[in-house]
Amino acid sequence: MIELGTGTAADTADLIMDVNESTFMKDVVEASDLVPVIVDFWAPWCGPCKTLGPALEAEVLAANGAVKMAKIDVDQNQMIAGQMQIQSIPAVFAFYKGQPIDGFQGALPPSEIKAFVARVIEAGG
């Protein structure tokens, strides 16, 4: 029997990854062929990022593998941020089958984060 809320650190590492320019293709684009991948563009100095990130992580973990999350520090990965035309953070994009399918900028309330993750999962079939 599988119980909710009993995930291990290994489970978390499989679902939520820190991604950089050298791993973006594998961890986001290629991984999105199997399940949608939500990409959180953030920076350590960004106040709203500090509340959005953990809220997104909680929803991704609650989805039990139906979606994954990649976290990208824009200060350390400026090339990806430029390619994605990130103008402000936090910025979130969802990828499926290698393409961005949804996204938003700025912090959202918990109900909208939950709805966003549900939309992404639904888009991924």
Q: For each predicted feature, which ranges?
A:
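Proteins that catalyze or organize thiol-disulfide redox chemistry
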Residues: 1-65, 78-79, 83-85, 89-91, ...
